[in-house]
Amino acid sequence: MTTKELFDRICRKRSFLCVGLDTDVKKIPPHLLNEDDPILAFNKAIIDATAEYCVAFKPNMAFYESMGSFGAHSFEKTIEYIRERYPDQFIIADAKRGDIGNTSDMYARSFFEHLKVDALTVSPYMGEDSISPFLSYAGKFTVLLALTSNKGSQDFQMMRDADGEYLFERVIRISQTWDNAGQLMYVVGATQASMLKDIREIVPDAFLLVPGVGAQGGSLEDVAEYGMNAHCGLLVNASRSIIYADNTEGFAAKAAGEAAAMQRQMEIALRAKALI
């Protein structure tokens, strides 16, 4: 998928919503626990309920890895289900990989060749040679952690150098000099919306993956105001506020309602910027 194709889908669905599949077996409705694969059953119901309102899904690998081989199987089957039933959806594997070159090459092969996801979150801490194996895959996107929504982001990401540049700004700026930088996206937390204007001066055209709207308290209005570009350039992720909106047999309908409400807000934002 290209960024143009992604933007076309955003315009068609009047949404830039990404639904995060942070599926915790301890939080899914009790009636699903009798299923052969409760995690997959929950995910299928959430996907079916929200696909109409979103353009992307982001399964978080840690929630599946915590279940061992059973969870890994659920992760793979979830991706297969999205790809088969909703082939227009952009799939982001939230795995936060990144290691020396040959190890990153194996990570890239796993996610882009075997699982066939569209994008993968990656840590840039080890530098260009740890990222280049991911960028070698045409049509696939590498989503670099830039400015995250957690409190600990202050520890390193907000450190300034002698010229006053934040570390996260340096990460973004230098990464734009790498080969195939057009395949980079960046994670910028919604709780850091005040920094989006400055980030857009560094990467006016790149897509930003923005978690933190919903349960974490980030403002969708602020994100759209300061982060949207001429091609939208945003994928706003919501996880808990959608998938755990209800814990009864009506959980999927409630999730659909939450996703629909966010989609309506996003449509207003897109119209305000004259993008649709």
From Swiss-Prot:
Protein's pathway: Pyrimidine metabolism; UMP biosynthesis via de novo pathway; UMP from orotate: step 2/2
Top-level lineage group: Bacteria
EC number: 4.1.1.23
Single GO MF descriptor: orotidine-5'-phosphate decarboxylase activity
Keywords from the named record: Decarboxylase, Lyase, Pyrimidine biosynthesis
A Pfam family hit: OMPdecase
Active site: 96 (proton donor)
TM region(s), chain numbering: none
Xref: InterPro entries: Aldolase_TIM (IPR013785), OMPdecase_type-2 (IPR011995), OMPdeCOase_dom (IPR001754), RibuloseP-bd_barrel (IPR011060)
Gene Ontology process terms (BP): 'de novo' pyrimidine nucleobase biosynthetic process; 'de novo' UMP biosynthetic process
Enzyme category, top tier: lyase
Catalytic activity: orotidine 5'-phosphate + H(+) = UMP + CO2
Family: Belongs to the OMP decarboxylase family. Type 2 subfamily.
Protein name in the entry: Orotidine 5'-phosphate decarboxylase
Annotated organism of origin: Porphyromonas gingivalis (strain ATCC BAA-308 / W83)
Source species taxonomy: Bacteria, Pseudomonadati, Bacteroidota, Bacteroidia, Bacteroidales
Gene: pyrF
